[in-house]
Amino acid sequence: MSDDIKVLGISGSLRSGSYNSAALQEAIGLVPPGMSIELADISGIPLYNEDVYALGFPPAVERFREQIRAADALLFATPEYNYSMAGVLKNAIDWASRPPEQPFSGKPAAILGASAGRFGTARAQYHLRQTLVFLDVHPLNKPEVMISSAQNAFDAQGRLLDDKARELIQQQLQALQLWVRRLRG
C-alpha cells in the first residue's frame, strides 16, 4: 500500500458560489505532503428511488461509489439546513451505501462546514457524524472546522479570508493524515 493518502472531498452543496465547495478548494491548497484531494461531483445523482435501484445503480452513483472505494479517506463539507445536513448530501450517501457491498465501511473521514449562521454547521456536522458511524465510517473527532458568518469569511471569488479557519483546516488535514496512518496499522 502506498504511503500517499488519497482523500475524496465531498461537498454537500450544489450551489455555484457554495462556501462549502470553496472550503474544499481551500483544503486542496493546504494538504500536507503525502496527501491529495480529489473532488466528487454528486450533482448528477438522482433522488433515491427503490424502483430505480432495482434496475441497477445509475452511472453517476456508480462513479461516486468507485471514487469512495478508491479513496483512503473522506472529507465532507456540509452546509446546514434546518438543523441537519443538506438533503443532496444525504441522498448521495443513501445511494452509495446500498448493497451489495458497502464502499464507506472502514473509511476514515473528516467533516468541515461553512454557514452564514453563527453556529457554523455544528448541528449538521453532528447529524452527519451519526449517519457515518452507522455506515462504519471512522470520523475524526478533532479539530472541528465550523466556519460561521461565511459571507464574511470568504471573498467574492471564494477565497477563504479567515486565517483562523484556514489554520483549522490545515490542522484537520494533518490530523486526518495521522488518523489514516493509525487506522492502517
Swiss-Prot record:
UniProt GO cellular component terms: cytosol
Binding site for NAD(+): S115, A116, G117, R118, F119, G120, T121, A122
GO molecular function, one term: NAD(P)H dehydrogenase (quinone) activity
Lineage, opening ranks: Bacteria, Pseudomonadati, Pseudomonadota, Gammaproteobacteria, Pseudomonadales
Gene3D superfamilies found in the cross-reference section: 3.40.50.360
Co-factor(s): FMN
Family according to the record: Belongs to the SsuE family.
SUPFAM superfamilies: Flavoproteins
Domain of life (superkingdom): Bacteria
Binding sites annotated in the UniProt record for FMN: S13, L14, R15, S16, G17, S18, Y19, N20, Y81, N82, Y83
Known function: Has NAD(P)H-dependent FMN reductase activity.
Subunit record text: Homodimer.
EC assignment: 1.-.-.-
Protein name per its UniProtKB record: NAD(P)H-dependent FMN reductase PA1204
One of the Pfam families matching this protein, by short name: FMN_red
InterPro entries linked to this entry: Flavoprotein-like_sf (IPR029039), FMN_Rdtase-like_dom (IPR005025), NAD(P)H-dep_reductase (IPR050712)
Originating species: Pseudomonas aeruginosa (strain ATCC 15692 / DSM 22644 / CIP 104116 / JCM 14847 / LMG 12228 / 1C / PRS 101 / PAO1)
Keywords from the UniProt entry: Flavoprotein, FMN, NAD, NADP, Nucleotide-binding, Oxidoreductase
Enzymatic class: oxidoreductase
